Amino acid sequence: MITLTPGHLTLPQLRQIARESVQLTLDPASFAKIDAGAKAVADIAAKGEPAYGINTGFGRLASTHIPHDQLELLQKNLVLSHAVGVGEPMARSSVRLLMALKLSSLGRGHSGIRREVMDALIKLFNADVLPLIPVKGSVGASGDLAPLAHMSAVLLGVGEVFIRGERASALDGLRVAGLAPLTLQAKEGLALLNGTQASTALALDNMFSIEDLYRTALVAGALSVDAAAGSVKPFDARIHELRGHQGQIDAAASYRDLLAGSPINQSHLDCDKVQDPYSLRCQPQVMGACLDQMRHAADVLLVEANAVSDNPLIFPDTGEVLSGGNFHAEPVAFAADNLALAASEIGALAERRIALLIDATLSGLPPFLVRDGGVNSGFMIAHVTAAALASENKTLAHPASVDSLPTSANQEDHVSMATFAARKLADIADNTKHILAIELLAAAQGVDLRAPYHTSPKLAPVMETIRGKVAHYELDHYFAPDIAVIAKLVGERAFAKVAPFSFASEQ
């Protein structure tokens, strides 16, 4: 059970919400602020004075006054008309994060929503009744309206859900959670819809996957150093201290730890080779830059996870209703775009190491890592697959945040595209996962070919894990299943666990 303290969520909590089947409860310390916000909205609605989002239309229709007897209909219509998403359902882990983030934002007491509505969201979450939310349809301002409308429609008994993973109607989902359809009061529909929770949830969910891939890439890169008979001297701490970038310093330390005591390395200390290619030698510099970007993105997304991104905002102490633009997800878009650059570079560097290993001139290994080359093609086309994926990532890494299209009759004339920026991270991560799987297979093959010498004590379990699933490549065979089984292990963090390094979300 995780106690949500609005405004004080942590990265480990968020990773746990996404990756584990934990349940949620709301910190009772937040109740007074929530109730005060709801009372403030009720008082404003009762007076009848125009207040945006409470008794007016929305967007370009903000100047249209809504009579008091139509306020409930206004909120219902808002939810139903905005539930216009398309595409595949959002991943379960992302929906869980979305709901938790929405509860945190509402729980800070500046949205004017009743606890009854929040309690319903918690009951759905804890019963594993998750709204079916189409993943496409948000431009990231005014908030993630369409995705959050699909979440909110379930509270009205409209739409679809997944009940413990099985697709069902919203009404069935409410029954399983012990709920009846709600009637939303003034501003409650808008409070549920307005916010950056969809884009932030997608970005966080994919960031956790990319963090795992980063750790896997450290392991794969270190194994490739041994496979290519590369030097460990470029990882000397003194080199990296002189430059000063913390990510680079930390990455170099990881490579030193992983490669310490390698018999392969000891076997070629007196060789004539002066310098390794950049894909081996510059790993700390490249991976360090990725790490710095990822850490910055995590900081930004944690702030956003704890933010109130509603509009308008209620200030119960003064009775004021202030309209602003906290729904604009530009910080999330930038963070997601930075993560895309990092994840793409992780894959690009791994692809270059695969190319090095299969090149006999550079690696000193048999061409394409197989004996009897010619009749056997070995890793030739596995590298082509890695190259295809790396190239695809370069296109996917184009920043989404540089694009904007005006909406709502030019009232909403600049938008963030944060949801797309966050959503495409999943494709980049999947591509990078498969590139790393191919590298792990190639590096393991190279290490085998260095016999009688072995890799380091820290990397020996990696070899055992790989060889426990995939045999040494002796002769050409149907290769795709080998890649698939190692990619599955990558996704399960089997190799990430070996890296002597952890992110803030894992602590």
Swiss-Prot record:
Q: Which domain of life is it from?
A: Bacteria
The GO terms this record gives for MF are: histidine ammonia-lyase activity
Compartments where located:
Cytoplasm
InterPro entries associated with the record: Aromatic_Lyase, Fumarase/histidase_N, HutH, L-Aspartase-like, Phe/His_NH3-lyase_AS
Main localization is cytoplasm
Enzyme superclass (EC):
lyase
In-chain residues carrying the UniProt-annotated modification 2,3-didehydroalanine (Ser)? S142
Entry keyword set: Cytoplasm, Histidine metabolism, Lyase
PROSITE patterns referenced in this protein's UniProt entry, alphabetically: PAL_HISTIDASE
Q: What is this protein called?
A: Histidine ammonia-lyase
| Organism of provenance | Burkholderia lata (strain ATCC 17760 / DSM 23089 / LMG 22485 / NCIMB 9086 / R18194 / 383)
Question: Highest lineage ranks of the organism?
Answer: Bacteria, Pseudomonadati, Pseudomonadota, Betaproteobacteria, Burkholderiales
Task: Provide the gene name from the record.
Answer: hutH
